[in-house]
């Protein structure tokens, strides 16, 4: 009799995705981040569900409902900080996952890559709206500043912003709709993840060498199930260390002050994982130009597959490209630092140079470097 996992319509899908999936024999820890993102999404949906049971999306009670969760609900503080810091872990894994894709040329799987970009935008939108919900000072002013950017769109801008706000400022209507969207989006993300995996399993995983590995495949279970579980344990350990020892390390103290439309905080800034994009936005003096640069800083990922000039897929055997890649990483860290600094000298010019270098590296230097490497190899 054939095993039920190979015949049952539902179990067959699970079997082909997690058990009998042929996987390259040489994929490194950089390939763990996909499953870690799945774990992060599950943690966020579960903790978010329990938070939603006690949260009220009303301007009068939102802040105090979060306080109530932390003070009065059984382990409410734990659920709240797991959710807040879980978002940080989510973005760490996301950026590592995208970085891995760029380094090893995984972007040549176009459908998988493009759905990944849509997923990135969806997760960023969800995180932004989630940050508004506690209705602290930074929640309110962050929402005001970021939604206001849409007013830079010619002709329809102002109307669009007022439509999103549900009034003439960020108020009760805005908070209610942000809560609704923040609740529904993770489930849309989960559906997109399924499509992401569907397209990935059409081609199979890439591997560090970038060479087709059809001749050397191993079953996903037990080799990569055990490897993923090790990753899960490390992620949970790091998350628990963060939550139990310094839960507010990555947060903003201003968000412990209830939202006040009459009092602007001295430095309005988003959560740390958006600072690089915020720095790019601020580096251009023109409003529309800044918004375009902000969108392009993420959307540029869609252009990367078409700028792949190398005869090799991966950067594993391309030392000059490797140097440029790590300069790009350093540049993004610089932008993250600048995004958290006030708008004054020397931070303005550093931010402008780092923003210029970011686009220059991706659009010009890396493709040109690939061509030079081809010449060096006489290809």
From Swiss-Prot:
Residues noted as binding heme b b566 in the record, renumbered to the chain: 97, 196
Membrane topology of the entry: Multi-pass membrane protein
Binding residue positions for heme b b562: 83, 182
Entry keywords, A to Z: Electron transport, Heme, Iron, Membrane, Metal-binding, Mitochondrion, Mitochondrion inner membrane, Respiratory chain, Transmembrane, Transmembrane helix, Transport, Ubiquinone
Note describing how the cofactor binds: Binds 2 heme b groups non-covalently.
InterPro entries per record: Cyt_b/b6_C, Cyt_b/b6_C_sf, Cyt_b/b6_N, Cytb/b6-like_sf, Cytochrome_b, Cytochrome_b_C_euk/bac, Cytochrome_b_N_euk/bac, Di-haem_cyt_TM
Cellular component annotations (GO), alphabetically ordered: mitochondrial inner membrane; respiratory chain complex III
Chain positions recorded as a ubiquinone binding sites: 201
Cofactor: heme b
UniProt GO MF annotations: metal ion binding; ubiquinol-cytochrome-c reductase activity
Pfam families hit by this protein: Cytochrom_B_C, Cytochrome_B
Cellular compartment(s): Mitochondrion inner membrane
A GO BP annotation: mitochondrial electron transport, ubiquinol to cytochrome c
Main localization category: mitochondrion
Residues spanning the membrane: 33-53, 77-98, 113-133, 178-198, 226-246, 288-308, 320-340, 347-367
Note, other: Heme 1 (or BL or b562) is low-potential and absorbs at about 562 nm, and heme 2 (or BH or b566) is high-potential and absorbs at about 566 nm.
Subunit structure of this chain's protein: The cytochrome bc1 complex contains 11 subunits: 3 respiratory subunits (MT-CYB, CYC1 and UQCRFS1), 2 core proteins (UQCRC1 and UQCRC2) and 6 low-molecular weight proteins (UQCRH/QCR6, UQCRB/QCR7, UQCRQ/QCR8, UQCR10/QCR9, UQCR11/QCR10 and a cleavage product of UQCRFS1). This cytochrome bc1 complex then forms a dimer.
General function of this protein: Component of the ubiquinol-cytochrome c reductase complex (complex III or cytochrome b-c1 complex) that is part of the mitochondrial respiratory chain. The b-c1 complex mediates electron transfer from ubiquinol to cytochrome c. Contributes to the generation of a proton gradient across the mitochondrial membrane that is then used for ATP synthesis.
Family: Belongs to the cytochrome b family.
Protein name in the entry: Cytochrome b
């Amino acid at each position: 009799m054939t095993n039920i996992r190979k015949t049952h319509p539902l179990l067959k899908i699970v079997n082909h995705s997690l058990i009998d999936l042929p996987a390259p024999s040489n994929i490194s820890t950089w390939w763990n981040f996909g499953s870690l993102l799945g774990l992060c999404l599950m943690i966020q949906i579960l903790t978010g569900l329990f938070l939603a049971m006690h949260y009220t999306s009303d301007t009068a009670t939102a802040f105090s409902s979060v306080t109530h969760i932390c003070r009065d609900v059984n382990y409410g503080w734990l659920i709240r900080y797991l959710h807040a810091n879980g978002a940080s872990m989510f973005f760490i894994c996301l950026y590592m996952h995208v970085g891995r894709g760029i380094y090893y040329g995984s972007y040549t799987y176009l459908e998988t890559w493009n759905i990944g970009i849509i997923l990135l935008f969806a997760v960023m939108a969800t995180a932004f709206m989630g940050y508004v919900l506690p209705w602290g000072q930074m929640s309110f002013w962050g929402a005001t500043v970021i939604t206001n950017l849409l007013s830079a769109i010619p002709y329809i801008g102002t109307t669009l912003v007022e439509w999103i706000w549900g009034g003439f400022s960020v108020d009760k209507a805005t908070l209610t709709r942000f809560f609704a969207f923040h609740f529904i989006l993770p489930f849309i993300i989960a559906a997109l993840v399924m499509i992401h995996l569907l397209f990935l399993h059409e081609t199979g995983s890439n591997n560090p060498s970038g060479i087709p590995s059809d001749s050397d495949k191993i079953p996903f279970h037990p080799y990569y199930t055990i490897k993923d579980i090790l990753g899960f344990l490390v992620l949970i350990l790091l998350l628990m260390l963060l939550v139990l020892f310094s839960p507010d390390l990555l947060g903003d103290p201003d968000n412990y002050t209830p939202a006040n439309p009459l009092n602007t905080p001295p430095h309005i800034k988003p959560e740390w994982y958006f600072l690089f994009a915020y720095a790019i936005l601020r580096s251009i003096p023109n409003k529309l130009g800044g918004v375009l640069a902000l969108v392009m800083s993420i959307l540029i990922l869609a252009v990367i597959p078409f700028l792949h000039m190398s005869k090799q897929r991966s950067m594993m055997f391309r030392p000059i490209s490797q140097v440029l890649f790590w300069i790009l990483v350093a540049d993004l860290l610089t932008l993250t630092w600048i995004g958290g600094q006030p708008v004054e000298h020397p931070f303005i010019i550093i931010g402008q140079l780092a923003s210029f270098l970011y686009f220059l590296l991706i659009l010009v230097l890396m493709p040109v470097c690939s061509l030079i490497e081809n010449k060096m190899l006489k290809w």
